[in-house]
Amino acid sequence: MKILFGVQTTGNGHIARAKEIISILTKRAEVDVIFSGPKANKISFKHPIKKHYRGLTFFYTKKGKIHWVKTLLKNNFLKLFIDILECDVHSYDLILNDFEPITAWSSYLKNKKCIALSNQFSLLSDKGPKLNKRFKTSLRILRYFAPAQSGYGFHFKKFDTNIFLPIIRKEIRKLKVNDLGHYLVYLPSYNRDEIKKVLITFPSIKWFVFSQEFETPKLEKNIYWETINENTFSKCLASCKGVITAAGFSTLSEALYLKKPVLTIPIGSHIEQIYNAKMIREMGGIVIKRLSIKHRKQIQNWIKNPKVIPIKLNQKNYEVVDRILIDYIKSKAESKYNSYKTFLTKTI
């Protein structure tokens, strides 16, 4: 069996999940990988990448919201269309897609079945958290960003038959968990000044902030500015007292797996993060609208009363891969059976 796996590279979560899935898939089939999106990700990825397209990328304001004007102006939609037409999808038996538009749209236009495998796909289920009606347009955009005929989603709860629990990296599963008293902060859509403005008002707290703005670590009063590094981040996460993070699925999943208290600040206008944050709140977690002095008291209350969300993330990663492949084989067998049945009916 030959499989094409399209992976979105915005953030590190899609790559981290694909890394685990592909390590299992390659033991069962031949796998080609296509990336699209930014190239400056910090997750090590050993499997060969057949092609890395520019794709589509979201841009953000300095205060943690999607910058829609910049997103529209800085993406090259003509190049995107050419890449979609040129992408080879006919050479594969199975096409998997983690929110990656090139392989998804190429499959759609060339009448090839594409199976979604992403956190975003779970938002399309009617059985998950209900969002405000004002997000109806955002859901439509989400559906057509990387269209798929069917798929599997990931979330903190199995609220539908095709929803899995999060994929947890092997490196995270092996970590020794303790509490060294510091707090980890990961808010990639905020710039350093906005983060510093709030964190320095807690002088007794040791903050480790991971930011793409730094090429080398730097100490500034009680703030340790860290570069984005997979190993450093994982070790800091395992030994922290709590985590302040955006509502990105992977960081939240890993923090919950390690039983760390989380304070969640979703990116403004980002439907997936708003959805994730809503579920975190429903599970008893703390969510604030933005990082600002206005919300200082809520941050202080969270520090004084840390709460671990009770959740079991004990799913085996190979169970996900096996379910996908078994479903695919069953659907192919059923399709052949129906074809034979139709042929025999017409013949007789």
Task: State what each model feature region is.
Residues 300-348:
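C-terminal amphipathic helix plus adjacent low-complexity
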Residues 252, 256-307:
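Catalytic binding pocket for nucleotide-activated donors in carbohydrate/polymer assembly enzymes
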Residues 125-191, 210-212:
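A nucleotide-sugar donor-handling region in carbohydrate enzymes
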Residues 109-125:
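Active-site proximal beta-strand in glycosyltransferases
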Residues 22, 169-242, 292, 296:
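Donor-nucleotide binding loops and adjacent catalytic segments primarily
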Residues 95-101, 106, 116, 236-275:
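A donor-sugar binding/catalytic signature common to diverse glycosyltransferases
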Residues 65-94, 99-102:
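Conserved nucleotide-sugar donor-binding subdomain of glycosyltransferases
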Residues 8-12, 27, 31-78:
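Conserved nucleotide-sugar phosphate-binding/catalytic loop shared by glycosyltransferases and other
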